[in-house]
């Protein structure tokens, strides 16, 4: 079995609007290995969630997906029909959404929804499916699992609903899980529990995990590798250690300056921020998308598109015309 669970090349998502074409995701390349956690991080509106929906082929009707390569465990799923993708979703790859209350059907019990998933993808009797659903609820830390199977989503707390979503996603033991901001709607204590649970289950089932988030604290806890998105593009990617200890792209560095560091950030000191606004992605765009907000911008930055470059290693790459040496001098200054 291949260690490479997900392999994506040149993913773009365009959305036709009355004012033009919105280039929401542009030229995204990703890969995830078995047992690895890839965190996709960036500001709201940068294209993180659209990227995850594009991988699952769940984009809105008007959105146009183009992609050169989409492989799951070495097998191409590019060009699959909706019927074929429905066999993949929930079976070989699963998704955990940000707000479980909008993902679970309020008209059906937890048990009915979990059993339906199993009967769709596995040749099981109703009794066997119910037993497996109960077992999975217990595995994700839900007590009184038999009782929970008979309850409706509104009868559970936010944390319990998210655990139910995780249990449903794991029912068929998928090779890949995509989690889109799975802890945003939860308080800090429950958030930590859910992250720990995801990591433990990932290790147990030997899955690949793509975690979409804007919370760098979450990234620091769970990531193996990190992809930083800005205005629809990946502007930097590398191991979690590289991104946190030696960020290269000016946008990534700006994000890191926004994080208060215990023991280093003085009480009352202003928090870091990135000045300016994200550019409009409607119509054609030439040059670096971060140019208007970057301290190192030159005319060259606006004249031509910038590709990811990896001058220092095969594991870290950044989208900037400036050399590592120049970026280092600017950081010191």
Regions found by a protein language model. Give the residues of each.
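Conserved ABC ATPase "signature" region
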Residues: 75-76, 128-147, 256-257
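P-loop NTP-binding/switch modules centered on Walker-like glycine-rich loops
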Residues: 57, 178-182, 186, 190-269
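A short, proline-enriched helix->beta-strand linker immediately N-terminal to the Walker B motif
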Residues: 171-175
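Charged, flexible cofactor/metal-binding loops and thiol motifs
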Residues: 239-333
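Conserved ABC ATPase signature
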Residues: 151-156, 160
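Conserved ABC transporter NBD signature motif
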Residues: 64-76
């Amino acid at each position: 079995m291949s260690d490479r669970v997900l392999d994506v090349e040149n993913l773009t998502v365009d959305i036709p609007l009355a004012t033009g074409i919105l280039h929401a995701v542009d030229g995204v390349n990703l890969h995830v290995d078995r047992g690895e956690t890839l965190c996709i991080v960036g500001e709201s509106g940068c294209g993180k969630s659209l990227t995850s929906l594009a991988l699952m082929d769940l984009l809105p009707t008007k959105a146009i997906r183009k992609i050169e390569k989409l492989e799951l465990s070495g097998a191409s799923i590019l060009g699959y029909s909706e019927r074929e993708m429905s066999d993949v979703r929930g079976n070989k790859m699963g998704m955990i959404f940000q707000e479980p209350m909008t993902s679970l059907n309020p008209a059906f019990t937890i048990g009915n929804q979990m059993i339906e998933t199993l009967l769709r993808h596995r040749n099981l009797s109703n009794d066997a499916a119910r037993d497996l659903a109960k077992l999975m609820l217990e595995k994700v830390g839900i007590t009184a699992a038999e009782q929970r199977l008979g309850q409706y989503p509104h009868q559970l707390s936010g944390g319990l609903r998210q655990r139910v979503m995780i249990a449903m996603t794991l029912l068929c033991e998928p090779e890949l899980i995509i989690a889109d901001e799975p802890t945003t709607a939860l308080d800090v204590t429950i958030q930590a529990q859910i992250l720990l649970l995801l990591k433990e289950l990932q290790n147990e089932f030997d899955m690949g995990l793509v975690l979409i988030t804007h919370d760098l604290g979450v990234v620091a806890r769970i990531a193996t590798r990190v992809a930083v998105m800005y205005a629809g593009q990946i502007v930097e990617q590398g191991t979690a250690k590289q991104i946190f200890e030696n960020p290269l792209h000016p946008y990534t560095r700006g994000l890191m300056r926004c994080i208060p560091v215990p023991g280093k950030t003085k009480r009352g000191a202003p928090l870091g921020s990135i000045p300016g606004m994200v550019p409009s992605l409607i119509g054609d765009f030439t040059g670096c998308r971060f140019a208007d907000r970057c301290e190192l911008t030159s005319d060259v930055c606006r004249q031509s598109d910038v590709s990811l470059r990896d001058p220092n290693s095969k594991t870290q790459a950044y989208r900037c015309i400036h050399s590592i040496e120049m970026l280092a001098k600017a950081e010191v200054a």
